[in-house]
Design a protein with these regions (language model features):
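Nucleotide-activated sugar donor-binding and catalytic core shared by glycosyltransferases
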Residues: 1-330
Length: 330
């Protein structure tokens, strides 16, 4: 069994797919006291290179959601790694990479812990269910309402933020639009809806991810950007409109930014499933961001978001705090 607080630093294998999974693990990792020689396993991207700068990192080939051949390749890569290196424990926040890495670690006698994504409000993901069925790893949820004897509660990465007033408003706010980095999924509906609001202009910045090939957008357009540019564009904007991806939302909250999060839908080919609806619901409950379906996004909602910012309510993350507040934060 994996011990949450060992009382001393230890060499950990820290495993996460890029995007929200990696963002969560970076924020949660200090709870487990990883030593300086701990090793991160993830995919190579501008996000991972920025977040893990100065850390020991082992990159593996990208695994798309529910790519089970990719999971086998991930298992092989981590198995080879464990044949030459030793670790005191392995921790993962998902997604597909966890399915290969944690069983490989357990087969080498390494205690393993899987923490389900904050976006899974109503129960575990496919990855979580498969790992639970394997009986090979310790399990944690960031939502105590569905905790069980096996799925024990762990502190939420979102519960340490609250909304504050900026005392400013704008009828034509400067926008930064960011659509994440998940491969193979476009989000043209959101792009078109933003254009329809009439708020996009020459000062708008777009980070499109894999919604490439658009030639009808005013302002500056990028596919992917490093974390340093993401921070710069976010701070320069009056409002940041994002897909409801956990990684992006966490980054924005850490910057003190109150985001407008728009849900990707599986039925429109925008994601593997509809889990972004759950993270959008949580934003509404905690009142640390506006959230909307694509058709609900309009100029009034965007302009209203310009009135708010976010601040942290504790100085550092602590695994003993409640995973979800008893009532919405204000």
């Amino acid at each position: 069994m994996f011990e949450i607080d060992s009382g001393h630093d230890r060499r950990l294998l820290l495993v996460a797919s890029t995007g929200g999974h990696l963002s969560q693990l970076v924020r949660l990792a200090p709870d487990f006291r990883p030593s300086d020689d701990s090793l991160w396993v993830t995919f190579k991207s501008p996000q991972s290179e920025s977040l893990l700068a100065g850390k020991n990192v082992h990159y593996v080939p990208y695994i798309r959601p529910r790519d089970y051949r990719g999971v086998r390749r991930g298992f092989t890569a981590v198995n080879r790694l464990l044949q030459r290196e030793q670790f005191d424990g392995a921790v993962s926040t998902g997604s597909a990479l966890a399915l290969g890495a944690l069983p490989a670690a357990r087969l080498h006698g390494v205690p393993c812990l899987y923490i389900e994504s904050i976006s899974r409000i109503n129960g575990p993901s496919v990855t979580g269910r498969l790992l639970a069925a394997s009986r090979m790893v310790s399990l944690r949820t960031q939502h105590p309402q569905w905790a069980t004897a096996r799925w024990r509660p762990h502190a939420s990465v979102l519960a340490t933020f609250e909304r504050v007033d900026k005392h400013t408003a704008s009828s034509r706010p400067k926008l930064f639009i960011t659509l994440g980095t998940i491969e193979g999924y476009r989000f043209d509906r959101l792009i078109d809806q933003i254009l329809a609001t009439g708020l996009a202009g020459d000062d708008t910045v777009w980070q499109l991810g894999y919604s490439t090939g658009r030639t009808d957008l005013p302002g500056r357009v990028f596919d992917q950007i490093p974390a340093s540019d993401f921070e710069k564009f976010s701070k320069e904007a009056d409002v940041v409109v994002t897909h409801a991806g956990v990684g992006t939302i966490l980054f924005l909250l850490d910057l003190g930014i109150y985001p407008v999060a728009v849900v990707r839908r599986h039925e429109h080919g925008e994601h593997i499933d509809n889990h972004q609806e759950q993270i959008a619901s949580l934003l509404r409950t905690l009142e640390v961001g506006h959230s909307a379906e694509v058709h609900e996004l309009d100029a009034d909602l965007i302009c209203d978001a310009a009135r708010f910012a976010v601040r942290g309510t504790v100085e550092e993350h602590n695994s003993s705090v409640p995973a979800t507040p008893a009532k919405p934060a204000t």
